[in-house]
Amino acid sequence: MKNIVLTGFMCSGKTTIGKMVAKKIGYRFIDTDEYIKNKTKMQISEIFEKYGEEKFREIESQCIKELSDIGGCVIATGGGVVLNAQNMENLKKNGVVFYLSTKPET
């Protein structure tokens, strides 16, 4: 089964909508930021502080690659995932990608 991948700016509703969709269709819900926190045993802000953005993006890309091999998931991505073309290619291999657009006041 293909994944459903949700992208968009911070606070665009990726997690909220992702959880609702996953429950409705019986898919597993995965938030990439939570996945990274569980894998590294560190908060995202802590990774940035200790190692910098470049290292965080490496970890993020590695996690995206892992998640792209799993099927039957609704995946809510961090806002920066779309900045890396390889991340998007990996997500598209086994998923349909949606961009959630919101108004600035949302």
What are the language-model segments listed below?
Residues L6:
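Hydrophobic anchor at the beta1->P-loop junction of P-loop NTPases
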Residues L91-T106:
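Conserved phosphate-donor/acceptor-positioning beta-strand/loop module used by diverse small-molecule
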